[in-house]
Amino acid sequence: MNFEWDAHKAASNLAKDGIGFEEAALVFADSRRLTLVDARHQTEIRENTTGMIAEILIVTVTHTERKGVIRIISARPARKRYHAHDS
């Protein structure tokens, strides 16, 4: 998989949520990840993928796909409702 992101947004995300986009991309290696369409956005298809990084951190990554490249928009620790993913 190929990834891209805006460098300023990545720095802002790291400062706000403590997760870098390079680290967030590891969610896509989790075979148990869950991806849902984010219906709030109508200008492009955005998805939220929740999965584990290094078997210790559950993260939700908001992303879109452009010309076969996954563009990471944001990443944050998953909310409690997603922690059932690990059961």
Put a short name on every predicted segment.
Residues 1-87:
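Ribonuclease/tRNase effector modules and their secretory precursors
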